[in-house]
Design a protein with these regions (language model features):
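Short beta-strand-to-loop acidic/aromatic patch adjacent to the donor-nucleotide binding site
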Residues: 107-119
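Terminal low-complexity segments of carbohydrate-biosynthetic enzymes
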Residues: 251-420
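Catalytic donor-sugar/metal-binding loop of nucleotide-sugar-dependent glycosyltransferases
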Residues: 213, 222-240
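Conserved catalytic core of nucleotide-sugar-dependent glycosyltransferases
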Residues: 121-203, 207
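Active-site donor/metal-binding and catalytic loop motifs
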Residues: 235-256
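N-proximal low-complexity "stem/linker" segments adjacent to membrane-targeting elements
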Residues: 1-26
Length: 420
């Protein structure tokens, strides 16, 4: 089965519609998919009906529309939230997670995921993605692709943030002899494009996995696979340049664009190393890694510049350097703040108010005692990646949940059939 997380704007916005229609045309030629699940977010009932009509128009008959704003799906989300599973935050992570439940409910053995914004999609890419799992019995396959379009390099978060950060971490861990961290970093570096959203899972693996619900979902998924799978494949998704929608830079807004993506990716990576691998993070560690990151990024940018010149690609070195120093460096520092706060904040304040006489009157009324108490209360505080539980755990606690999902999907299918 195939899962496609889909926003209504993928087919209602004129600039996105041609890309989506091309995906449908290509999928109509694929014969080995039992079902194609469109996890539809941010859509009205009318837009859900529009999607159903579009699917029929372009020959997609084996579809399921998982309308997350529909009455049936809202009932399922409420049941899961009432059970304490924390699926109350809309977004791609929650959408995908429910799609995985739908796929399991109707008997999927293998579940693939692709994004709905691939401008250069071709059915052969899907064949490549499924082949290792479907034919060769791998548990997981991940797409590797060439992020070049309009005669320039894309994949900025991977090239300018993740790769140099991983190399900086490897350099630090190698020097300190911490091999367990080096093994994980080497595993992540082995993927040519760690942040691709195109993957296939064997169902027994997928049901044991947790999934992040922020922009760090891809790196979190790879680390989950590292822990829980034995046979992992990386496939060349396309021999042609791969193109999809690109995030705006949003340099002045840490809650949007590339800035937000970068913070989520770094905090997900580092917090996973803290929680699962026992990494100790301090202010010094964050500063040290940031300095090493800047050096490595500078080396890579020089290589990208040389590569672009040799390959006759457009390359704006100044823009790339500005991204590193103005966005990605700050994202690492911000992620470090998340991971070391709040107890380190009190430590800084204690140092400040005990070293300056201007704070005498505050010390006299007990501020130091309050700060020490706050520090003691929060010493063990850690940043946790927003994530789902596993479907294995949900099924264990609610054994009939898959039956309920089948019932809801059946009613939704009847609704879309009657509306023809």
């Amino acid at each position: 089965m195939l899962v496609i997380p889909t926003l209504a704007t993928e087919f209602t916005a004129e600039e996105n519609r041609p890309t989506f229609i091309n995906i449908l045309k290509q999928l109509s030629k694929v014969s080995y998919l039992k079902k194609i699940i469109f996890g539809l977010d941010s859509a009205t009932d009318e837009e859900a009906l529009e999607l159903a009509a579009l699917l029929r128009k372009y020959g997609i008959r084996n579809y399921i529309i998982q309308h997350n704003e529909g009455v049936g799906l809202k009932t399922l989300y409420k049941r899961l939230n009432d059970g304490g599973f924390g699926l109350d935050r809309p977004g791609k992570g929650r959408n995908m997670f429910m799609s995985f439940g739908v796929a399991q409910a109707i008997g999927a053995k293998y579940i693939g995921v692709i994004d709905a914004d691939i401008r250069t999609f071709h059915r052969r890419q899907l064949d490549r993605l499924f082949y290792p799992v479907l034919v060769l019995n791998y548990q997981f396959s991940k797409a590797s692709d060439l992020r070049i379009g309009d005669n320039r390099m894309y994949g900025r978060v991977k090239r300018l943030l993740l790769d140099p950060l991983l190399l900086a971490l490897k350099r630090k861990f190698w020097e300190s002899g911490e091999e367990r961290f080096v093994r994980l970093i080497d595993y992540l570096l082995a993927f040519n494009y760690q942040l691709s959203g195109e993957m296939v899972f064997e169902t027994n693996l997928l049901k044991r996995m947790h999934f992040a619900t922020n922009w760090g979902v891809e790196i979190f998924t790879l680390i989950e696979v590292y822990r829980k799978a034995n046979n992992i494949a990386q496939v060349q998704f396309s021999t042609r340049p791969f193109e999809h929608k690109h995030q705006p830079v949003s340099s002045d807004n840490p809650e949007g664009g590339l800035y937000k993506v970068a913070i989520d990716v770094v905090s997900t990576l580092l917090s996973t190393l803290v929680i699962e691998e026992g990494l100790e993070i301090s202010d010094y560690f964050v500063r040290d890694i940031t300095i090493t990151y800047l050096n490595v990024a500078d080396e890579l940018i020089r290589k990208y510049c040389d590569n672009a010149a040799f390959s006759k690609l457009e390359y704006d070195r100044n823009t790339e350097e500005a991204l590193v120093k103005g966005i990605f460096k700050n994202a690492i520092l911000a992620a470090g703040e998340f991971l070391t706060s709040p107890h380190l904040v009190s430590d800084r304040l204690l140092h400040l108010i005990t070293s300056d006489s201007r704070f005498d009157r505050y010390r006299d009324v007990g501020l130091i005692d309050e700060l020490i108490a706050y520090e003691n209360e929060n010493t063990n505080h850690i940043f946790e990646v927003p994530q789902t539980v596993s479907w294995e755990r949900i099924i264990m606690r609610q054994p009939d949940i898959l039956d309920d999902i089948r019932d809801v999907i059946g009613r939704e299918a009847a609704f879309f059939e009657e509306a023809q």
